[in-house]
């Protein structure tokens, strides 16, 4: 997602920004779903035409546009995964919903967008970044659990 923001700013404004700046933009004003009150942030980088440092303002709608392809990939992956879900697991998902984990879960309003697209309950893990590692550790420690959560092709 950071790379998508970096490329968007480069393409639209001819401004080269760093990865950390792109990440700060995502964290501060990035959103997967339109916000009631759009926000903006001042961005500093190097003008690719003149080579001189430059400052500009980018708003949350532009960031959402920059993230659209990444967000659509997430949506498509969720849909494909749900379509291939065994009936027993599908029933659990309808009852309990989907829990978002990982860095993407921290993107504002991703849960709202996925709820709208899937009509399923969506929650964000209490600690989305650690949840992946903890979950993987639990599965690797329990061979029976590993077989129940993996698909064989």
Which residues does each PLM region occupy?
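Phosphate-binding glycine-rich/basic clefts of nucleotide- and phosphate-handling proteins
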Residues: 1-68
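Residue-level signature of catalytic and energy-coupling elements of molecular machines
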Residues: 5, 78, 100, 136
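Interdomain boundary/hinge elements
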Residues: 16-21, 92, 127-128, 150-151
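Acidic, glycine/GT-rich loop-and beta-edge segments that sit at the periphery of enzyme/chaperone cores
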Residues: 18, 138-153
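Active-site lining segments that contact anionic ligands and/or coordinate catalytic metals
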Residues: 38, 53, 95-96, 119
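Phosphate/ATP-binding catalytic cores across multiple sugar-kinase/actin-like superfamilies
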Residues: 66-93, 139-142
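Glycine-rich phosphate-binding loops at beta-strand->alpha-helix junctions
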Residues: 90-114
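Conserved phosphate-binding/catalytic loops in two-lobed NTP-binding clefts
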Residues: 112-135, 146, 152
